[in-house]
Amino acid sequence: MMATQTLSIDSYQDGQQMQVVTELKTEQDPNCSEPDAEGVSPPPVESQTPMDVDKQAIYRHPLFPLLALLFEKCEQSTQGSEGTTSASFDVDIENFVRKQEKEGKPFFCEDPETDNLMVKAIQVLRIHLLELEKVNELCKDFCSRYIACLKTKMNSETLLSGEPGSPYSPVQSQQIQSAITGTISPQGIVVPASALQQGNVAMATVAGGTVYQPVTVVTPQGQVVTQTLSPGTIRIQNSQLQLQLNQDLSILHQDDGSSKNKRGVLPKHATNVMRSWLFQHIGHPYPTEDEKKQIAAQTNLTLLQVNNWFINARRRILQPMLDSSCSETPKTKKKTAQNRPVQRFWPDSIASGVAQPPPSELTMSEGAVVTITTPVNMNVDSLQSLSSDGATLAVQQVMMAGQSEDESVDSTEEDAGALAPAHISGLVLENSDSLQ
């Protein structure tokens, strides 16, 4: 790559920009200023074409040095890795304006068309320079990411291959073992076996594995408890090491998958807080966002966990309660429908035309008073002639009437503290052929 060269406005002076202008009008040579003796005149000067006139107008324009500088910056941005920035061009513009003002030179010429052409050309190159700067930044970002990825991959390969610098290399093993030897535990002190034996066991690296120094565990009293490694060399193959590492990674992945599959159990404190809120607002068990945030702060849960718990609670706790209450409602209505006045067992003409004597009362074991009203043609003696089956049936009807009244009071007066005792007005028996 080409080295980045420093460009400035000073490198584009009037003298240098005139070098690119082709002078079509050649001056006469001093040696050939006089015609020869034969009177042959010099060849006539060729006339300038319109293109040549336009070129001269561009080269002689006051903004041409700035245009050339910008063009050079764009070329350098495409050739080298270190591209020029737009900020440096802004500085060059300031320097150019300051220099033109200092020297008293104009910024434009007498031709407005040429001035417009130069300004537009500078604007186009300026936009091109900005785009090149963006591309350069993207390239640098890509290179940095790619290099970081390569470094990570190379470090992982070095870790598995056991090359120098990896944790499984002999150098790293010596450092780890030296750190272990200085560790004191309640069971004993771990020291190299070479420190206890006359012959030292040297460490060596063989092809395909690493040889480790044997280690012996010694109690604080100086007694040898056990020798954790054999005095011989221990060789760990790289393939076995890589296989073991792969197995460990697979176990870790399985543990992660099993932990994800397990359903999370919320703390008991959190469920108690949410359950209490649910029953306090059982009429409208839908917490607002602020209430959810407050509950999440109290229970150390996330908003998602709180929201899911309330959704499940409305379906699993409140819905069964609502279903059970709906199933008991028909029974209540059925019992209420049974609460009707005692049906008369004789014609209305007899009941309205005959005066009734004072009733006779019988006391039951439950404390209910049963009043038996006898018509004119019946007396107490005729009541004694009732069969036992008829009397039992009459008492059962009285008890059922009392129960129906109690249940009707429960269904219609839910806010009452206690139920009023049922008063049974009387039991009217029909003087029919079946009871005689």
UniProtKB/Swiss-Prot annotation:
Residues 259-321 bind DNA. Disulfide bonds: none annotated. Residues 1-49, 401-436 are annotated as: Disordered. Residues 404-416 have a biased composition (Acidic residues). The modification Phosphoserine is found at residues 33, 41. Residues 80-163 form the MEIS N-terminal domain. Residues 1-20 have a biased composition (Polar residues). Keywords: Activator, DNA-binding, Homeobox, Nucleus, Phosphoprotein, Transcription, Transcription regulation. Ubiquitous. Isoform 2 is expressed in all examined tissues except in bone marrow. Activates transcription in the presence of PBX1A and HOXA1. Belongs to the TALE/MEIS homeobox family. PANTHER family: HOMEOBOX PROTEIN TRANSCRIPTION FACTORS (PTHR11850). Interacts with MN1. This is Homeobox protein PKNOX1. The gene is PKNOX1.
